[in-house]
Amino acid sequence: METDNAQRIIGSTEYVEIAGIKNIPAKIDTGADSSAIWASDINMEADGTLVFSLFGKKSPLFTGKRIKTTDYRAKSIRSSHGDVQVRYRVKLPLELNGKNFETVFTLADRSKNNFPVLIGRRTIKGEFLVDTSKASVKPIHRPTTTIKLNQELKDNPQIFHHKYIKGKESK
C-alpha cells in the first residue's frame, strides 16, 4: 500500500487539474527547472494586481475566467532555444496523479507548444518518479511544418524535390 510519503510514479505526459480546470494535458520535463503554463491576456492593474486567463481563446481548455493575484514575482527565463524572456511567476493549485498541492508556474504563451502545461523538476522533486516508458497523454498539436511538407511531397514528389532539394543544391 502506498503511503503519503511514497514517491508516486508518473509518465512523461499526464493529465492534470489546475485552478479547477480538469483534464489538462501536461508534459513532465525533468530537463526543465521550473513549470510553465499557457496564459493569455496578461495585464497589470493600477494597484499592482496581476490579471490573466489560463490558455488562449482558441484553446478548448479556455474558460474565460480571469485570475487576479498580488502574490507574484518576475523571473528571467532562458528557453531551450537560448532566448531570454522575463515572465511572471504565480502560485496555482495543481492536482497531479491524485496529489493536490500548490506550485509555482511561469506564465507563458505556449500556444505553439505540444502541451499547454510543462511540469518541471522543482514541482516533482521528492514527490514523483518519472517513468519515461509511460505516457498518459498524446500531444494536442502536431508539428504543422512537417505535416505540410509531407503533404506537398505526397501531392507532387517532383515539384517537392525541385523546390526543397534540387533548388537548394545550386545555392
Regions found by a protein language model. Name each.
Residues M1-K171:
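Pepsin/retropepsin-fold aspartyl endopeptidases
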